[in-house]
């Protein structure tokens, strides 16, 4: 299993700080947030960790220069999450951990890998339950038990099929790269991972795993400070 950490975002919600320090390198306790995510990938059993970065994030490469299991690829254009993942295409099952999504309170990736093994190596998407009034902010799962039937992007409260939302972690088969390569660009010319996964669902089962930890979006100041508080409390 190879881990992919998309970390090419420009961090505009954290300006002017991110002109100097990439958001993924902001400290959580005494360590950069990205290092905690790399450790999560290792704990899940990833043999190699590919970090997708953009120009200007060389500080990230410098920090991990002595980590033999970490390598870097560049996303030269900001064309969506699917496009970022595609830059790191490998012939292996992939664990995708969003670089601005920190999970506090559990090792979500490890638990997802164990869940996948219990289900015959099935694809697994890490999820969280969200309040009904917030479903319009997330990709929401349509489920049959734990099996994913469909994914609905940012539905209204009335249209939401559940309160189970995508939460920054994916464990997918290598064939996802074939779907990404043939995925037509969507809004803004972006290639979205969710669209490719939906196509894959037509031929392959995938499951939602609601992990017990708390996801924090460290890509914005409020989420970052919430992550700091949660990390200290944990």
Question: Where would I find each of the regions flagged by the language model?
Answer:
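Conserved N-terminal catalytic core of the sugar/cofactor nucleotidyltransferase
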Residues: 1-5, 13, 26-27, 31-97, ...
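Short beta-strand segments
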Residues: 6-7, 96-99, 126-129, 210
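A structural signal for short hydrophobic beta-strand segments in well-ordered beta-sheet cores
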Residues: 25, 141-143, 208
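A conserved hydrophobic position in a structured secondary element of the catalytic/binding core
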Residues: 55, 104, 143, 171-172, ...
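Catalytic-core segments of class I nucleotidyltransferases/pyrophosphorylases
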Residues: 95, 117, 147-234
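Conserved donor-nucleotide/metal-binding helix-loop-beta segment in metal-dependent transferases, i.e.
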Residues: 105-135
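Ligand/cofactor pocket segment of small-molecule handling proteins
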Residues: 130-133, 137-146, 154
